[in-house]
C-alpha cells in the first residue's frame, strides 16, 4: 500500500537494516538471512493506534456496564492506587495485544509515561507517549514550570525517552482535558512543547455536555479556549472531537491538528462519535484509535476501522461518504502523520521503516476476496494477523512474542497489579 493504494499480487518485499529495501514482482537479489512465506497472506503497513491508554489495560471489563460518568469516576478512583510497577505490567499486556492485532505504533496518553516508554523500549514497538497532566491551579497561586511536579515529569521523560532508538519512541506534551486543568498549566506545557519541538495529546469535545459546560463557564468552546492559551500552537492530536462546533473545526483545520475518532469505545459507552466527513472537509487530519481497553473492551484496530465506516455510512446514508480506502488510510497514513512519522512509516514503500504486518487471507471469513482493500476493512479481524514487524524486527508471529515474556506479564498482572488497584481499595 502506497500513496496510490496500489495492490500487488505475488510480490516480494525485502528488508535490510530495518527498512524496506525492495518491493517488486521479481525475486530480489542476494541471499536473505530470513525468509517468511507469505503465501495466502496480505502484506500491509502496520496499523497506528492514535489514542490509547496502555497502562489501564489491567482494568479491562471492570466497569463495562456503568454509564460514562460513573465509569470515569470509578476508574479515576482505581487509578489513584496505581504505581509504576503495575503501570508497566499493564502496558506490557496492552502492547502484546496491540502487536497481536497488527499495531506497530501507538499514541499513549496516560499516567506513568516513563513506565509505558520503558515497556515500548523493551518490546520493540513504536510509540508517542504523553503524560495525561491534570490539576487546577488557584488563580492566586504562583505557577512555576520548573518546580511544578507534572511539568518536571514531562521534562524528565522528554530528556530520557524522546528520540530513543532513532525516534522509535517519541514524547509529546499532554493534558487530560480542558475541564480538569486550567490555563496556567496549559500555557506552561504549550510553551515547553513549542520550544522543544514536541507534539501535544489531549481529549477534546468528547461529549456535547463537555462543550456546553465550557461555553457556560467561559463563553468559549473547549477548542477556542485551548487555542487562546497556546495549546494549539504545536501539532495537536485531539481524541474525541464528537462535539466540535463549526468554528472549532475551522480552528483545528487552520492549525493542521489531528482529530482521533474512537468509534468502538464511544459506542460501548453510549457516546456519539465525531462526524468524519465534515471533519475531514474542514482540513483536519482524521486518524483512528481504540481508546483504552477499559473504554473499548479490546485494542483491535480492525474493529475500529469497520465501526468507523459503519457509523459514518449510517449517519450519512451514503457509503460513498467514507470508502474503505479512506478508512484504511486513517488507520495508517493519517496516524503516522499525527505522530510526526509520515516520512518513515504508514506505507509500504522502499526506504520507509519496515513496519508491516501479514494478514492471513486463507480463513473462511476472508474467502473469496474480490477486493483486498474492502476485505481488510469489512471482513478482517485482529486475530487474522499472522506477523507483526517493526523496523524490520519480528515482534509477533504465529502466537509467539519474541520480545515479551507473556507468562511473566500475566503473573505480574494477576499477582501484583490487580491486587494493587482493586483489592486494596475495597
Identify the residue ranges that each predicted region occupies.
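Divalent metal-coordination and catalytic microenvironments
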Residues: 13, 18, 40, 51, ...
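Metal-coordinating catalytic core of metallo-dependent amide/deamination hydrolases
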Residues: 117-242, 247-249
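Active-site microenvironment of metallo-dependent hydrolases
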Residues: 1-11, 16, 26, 331-426
Amino acid at each position: 500500500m502506497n500513496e496510490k493504494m496500489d495492490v500487488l499480487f505475488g510480490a516480494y518485499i525485502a528488508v535490510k537494516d530495518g527498512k524496506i529495501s525492495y518491493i517488486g514482482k521479481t525475486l530480489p537479489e542476494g541471499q536473505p538471512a530470513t525468509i517468511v512465506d507469505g503465501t495466502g497472506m496480505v502484506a500491509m503497513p502496520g496499523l497506528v493506534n492514535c489514542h490509547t491508554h496502555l497502562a489501564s489495560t489491567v482494568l479491562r471489563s471492570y466497569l463495562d456496564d456503568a454509564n460514562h460518568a460513573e465509569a470515569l469516576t470509578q476508574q479515576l478512583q482505581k487509578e489513584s492506587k496505581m504505581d509504576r510497577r503495575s503501570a508497566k505490567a499493564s502496558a506490557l499486556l496492552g502492547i502484546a495485544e496491540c502487536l497481536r492485532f497488527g499495531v506497530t505504533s501507538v499514541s499513549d496518553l496516560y499516567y506513568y509515561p516513563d513506565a509505558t516508554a520503558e515497556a515500548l523500549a523493551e518490546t520493540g514497538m513504536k510509540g508517542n507517549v504523553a503524560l495525561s497532566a491534570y490539576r487546577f491551579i488557584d488563580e492566586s497561586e504562583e505557577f512555576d514550570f520548573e518546580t511544578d511536579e507534572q511539568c518536571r515529569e514531562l521534562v524528565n521523560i522528554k530528556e530520557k525517552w524522546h528520540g530513543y532508538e532513532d525516534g522509535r519512541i517519541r514524547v509529546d506534551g499532554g493534558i487530560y482535558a480542558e475541564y480538569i486543568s486550567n490555563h496556567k498549566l496549559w500555557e506552561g506545557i504549550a510553551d515547553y512543547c513549542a520550544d522543544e519541538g514536541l507534539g501535544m495529546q489531549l481529549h477534546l469535545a468528547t461529549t456535547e455536555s463537555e462543550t456546553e459546560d465550557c461555553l457556560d463557564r467561559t463563553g468559549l468552546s473547549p477548542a477556542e479556549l485551548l487555542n487562546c492559551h497556546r495549546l494549539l500552537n504545536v501539532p495537536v492530536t485531539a481524541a474525541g472531537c464528537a462535539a466540535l462546533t463549526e468554528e472549532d473545526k475551522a480552528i483545528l483545520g487552520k492549525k493542521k491538528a489531528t482529530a482521533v475518532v474512537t468509534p468502538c469505545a464511544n459506542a460501548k459507552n453510549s457516546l456519539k462519535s465525531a462526524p468524519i466527513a465534515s471533519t475531514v472537509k474542514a482540513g483536519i487530519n482524521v486518524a483512528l484509535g481504540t481508546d483504552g481497553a477499559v473504554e473499548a473492551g479490546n485494542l483491535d484496530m480492525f474493529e475500529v476501522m469497520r465501526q468507523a465506516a459503519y457509523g459514518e455510512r449510517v449517519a450519512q446514508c451514503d457509503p460513498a461518504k467514507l470508502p474503505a480506502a479512506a478508512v484504511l488510510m486513517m488507520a495508517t497514513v493519517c496516524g503516522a502523520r499525527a505522530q510526526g512519522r509520515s516520512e518513515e512509516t504508514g506505507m509500504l514503500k522502499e526506504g520507509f521503516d519496515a513496519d508491516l504486518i501479514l494478514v492471513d487471507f486463507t480463513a473462511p471469513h476472508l474467502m473469496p476476496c474480490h477486493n483486498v482493500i474492502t476485505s481488510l476493512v469489512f471482513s478482517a479481524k485482529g486475530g487474522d494477523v499472522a506477523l507483526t514487524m517493526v523496523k524490520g524486527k519480528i515482534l509477533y508471529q504465529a502466537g509467539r512474542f519474541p520480545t515479551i515474556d507473556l507468562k511473566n506479564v500475566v503473573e505480574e498482572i494477576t499477582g501484583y497489579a490487580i491486587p494493587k488497584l482493586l483489592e486494596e481499595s475495597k
